[in-house]
């Protein structure tokens, strides 16, 4: 059976609730379809949803399990969960079945819509931008010192100053992220990956 056969099999649950239930399970948290918006349920358990339109390479860089929306030959939408990614093959969960499929096969049915969960390190809600004074800056400074060895002794510690911005830009360049000094979702996820934050599911092994 190919991917199309599984998509057209009406006995396999391929709805968003099935996909969210599997995704929440990978993160070790609880999902109840009858309790409302899944992203609100995630937030209540210290996770955030991130819904994007992008490429497989972008998902590889994020290195988090992702729900993809696939469109079959009849135009019907189906949700699958990508649990592992290699160079040319993905492991997906479709309903309760695990399949290894080529990225080429996925590309025939996928137009780029995906959703991931990620775990913010602190309770700050907004991006960290140069010049801001925020509790999240303390986390950023400490995290980069662990990852890169670059120590910024700026006082006050919660002020995002010029030295820290330079370290952030260097880090973003190394990670092939947008080099703008703004610590948004992608930069925070990259930092969490390098820190190997406990209880975080990855798509591929960390080198």
Sequence positions of predicted segments:
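Short acidic, glycine/serine/threonine-rich helix-capping segments at coil-helix boundaries
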Residues: 128-135, 142-194, 200-206
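Structured segments of extracytoplasmic/periplasmic soluble domains
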Residues: 22-33, 56-62, 69-72, 88, ...
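Extracytoplasmic/secreted envelope proteins and their assembly/folding machinery
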Residues: 16-24, 65, 79, 103, ...
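Short beta-strand-centered aromatic/proline hotspots
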Residues: 78-84
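Extracytoplasmic glycan-interaction modules
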Residues: 1-7, 56, 121, 151, ...
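Cysteine-nucleophile protease catalytic domains, especially the papain-like/related folds used
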Residues: 1-67
């Amino acid at each position: 059976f190919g991917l199309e056969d599984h998509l057209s099999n009406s006995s396999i649950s391929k709805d968003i609730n099935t996909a969210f239930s599997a995704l929440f399970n990978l993160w070790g948290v609880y999902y109840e379809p009858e309790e409302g918006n899944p992203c609100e349920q995630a937030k209540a358990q210290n996770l955030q949803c991130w819904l994007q339109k992008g490429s497989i390479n972008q998902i590889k860089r994020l290195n988090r399990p992702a729900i993809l929306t696939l469109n079959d030959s009849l135009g019907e939408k189906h949700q699958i969960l990508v649990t592992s990614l290699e160079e040319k093959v993905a492991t997906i969960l479709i309903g309760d079945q695990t399949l290894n499929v080529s990225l080429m096969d996925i590309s025939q049915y996928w137009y780029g819509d995906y959703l991931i969960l990620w775990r913010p390190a602190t309770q700050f809600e907004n991006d960290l931008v140069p010049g801001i004074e925020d509790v999240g800056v303390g986390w950023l400074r400490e995290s980069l010192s662990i990852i890169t060895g670059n120590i910024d002794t700026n006082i006050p510690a919660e002020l995002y100053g010029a030295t820290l911005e330079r370290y952030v830009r260097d880090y973003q360049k190394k990670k092939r992220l947008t080099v703008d000094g703004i610590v948004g979702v992608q930069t925070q996820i990259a930092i969490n990956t390098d820190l190997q934050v406990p209880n975080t599911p990855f798509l591929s092994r960390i080198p």
